[in-house]
Regions:
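Bacterial N-terminal signal peptides
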Residues: 1-9
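Mid-chain, structured segments of secreted extracytoplasmic proteins
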Residues: 60-102
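Sec/Tat signal peptide C-region and signal peptidase I cleavage site
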Residues: 10-16
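Flexible, processing/modification-adjacent segments and terminal tails
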Residues: 17-35, 41, 50-52, 84-159, ...
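A short, sequence-level motif marking secondary-structure junctions
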Residues: 58-62, 84-86, 103-107, 191-194, ...
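N-terminal, post-signal-peptide region of Sec/Tat-exported proteins
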Residues: 39-67, 71-75
C-alpha cells in the first residue's frame, strides 16, 4: 500500500513538472532572454480597418520587473513601471507617480499587463486539462495540449488562463483570458514567425468576445538583450527625470 501511494505521488509530481516545463517552453517563444528590450507596436482594428496605432519600448528584467516607455507622439513622456505586484504610471508633468492596475487599458483590448508581462511561468500554476485539435490563425489543424493556468500573484493580469500549446513544438497557439469575476475578458491568438533563425511569437492578436468587429494586434518588432541600470526601476527617479532617452 505504501509503495502504491509513493508511486502515485511520484507520478503526480512528474506530470506537474512536465506541465511546468510546457509553460516555460511556451514562455521562451515569447521572450528568450531574462533582461530585454522589446519594441512593440499596438494596432487597433475595427471592421478590419486600422483605427489607431501606438508604439512602446518595454524593458524587462527578472523578478517580474518591467519599464514601459510610451513612444508615440500623443503619449510622449509617459512611462509605466511594474515592480512585482505594483504598477505605476508616470506622466511627464506630474510630481508623483500614479498607482494603476495591470488591467488599465492602453489601446483597444491591449492593457498594461498585456504589454508589460511577456511570460506566464512566474505568475501562474498550470495543470493539464487534456489534448485538443484546434484550427490556427493560418487555418491549419494542430494537435494541442490544453493547460489551465491559475494566478499565484496579486499582480497577475488575469485570474485564470486556458492555454493551448502545440503538442510537438510547445508553441503557444491561443489563450482564453479570464477576469477575477470568472468572466472571459478576451481571447489571444499567437502568430508564428522567425527571429534570428528561431521560431518565435512575433505578434499577439487580442479579440474582444463582446465586440467581435474590433481586434487589437501587438507586434513584437524587435527583441534584444539589454540590461538597464537599477535607477530606471525607481518610480521616484522616473518622476524626477521625465525626459529620458530610452
Amino acid at each position: 500500500m505504501l509503495l502504491f501511494v509513493l508511486n502515485a505521488i511520484f507520478v503526480g509530481q512528474s506530470i506537474a513538472n512536465d506541465v511546468a516545463d510546457m509553460v516555460k517552453r511556451a514562455d521562451e517563444y515569447r521572450l528568450d532572454s531574462s533582461s530585454s528590450k522589446v519594441v512593440s507596436k499596438v494596432t487597433l482594428f475595427e471592421h478590419d480597418q486600422i483605427d489607431k496605432t501606438r508604439e512602446y519600448h518595454v524593458y524587462t528584467r527578472p523578478n517580474r520587473e518591467s519599464l514601459v516607455v510610451f513612444k508615440s507622439a500623443v503619449e510622449a513622456g509617459q512611462k509605466m513601471l511594474m515592480l512585482g505586484d505594483n504598477y505605476w504610471l508616470v506622466m511627464p508633468k506630474s510630481r508623483r507617480p500614479i498607482r494603476i492596475t495591470p488591467m488599465q487599458k492602453l489601446l483597444g483590448e491591449a492593457s498594461i499587463g498585456d504589454i508589460s508581462t511577456l511570460t506566464w511561468s512566474d505568475d501562474y500554476q498550470a495543470t493539464m486539462v487534456g489534448t485538443e485539435s484546434i484550427i490556427t490563425q493560418e487555418k491549419l489543424s494542430v494537435d494541442t495540449h490544453k493547460l489551465n493556468l491559475i494566478a499565484t500573484t496579486k499582480g497577475a493580469s488575469y485570474q485564470r488562463i486556458d492555454l493551448w500549446v502545440d503538442v510537438i513544438k510547445g508553441f503557444p497557439i491561443k489563450a482564453d483570458l479570464y477576469l477575477r469575476s470568472g468572466k472571459l475578458a478576451k481571447q489571444a491568438q499567437f502568430t508564428q514567425g522567425e527571429r534570428e533563425g528561431r521560431l518565435q511569437v512575433v505578434a499577439m492578436t487580442l479579440i474582444d468576445k463582446i465586440q467581435p468587429a474590433k481586434k487589437t494586434i501587438i507586434e513584437y518588432q524587435s527583441i534584444m538583450p539589454i540590461t538597464l541600470e537599477d535607477k530606471y526601476y525607481s518610480p521616484a527617479y522616473l518622476t524626477r527625470n521625465s525626459k529620458l532617452d530610452l
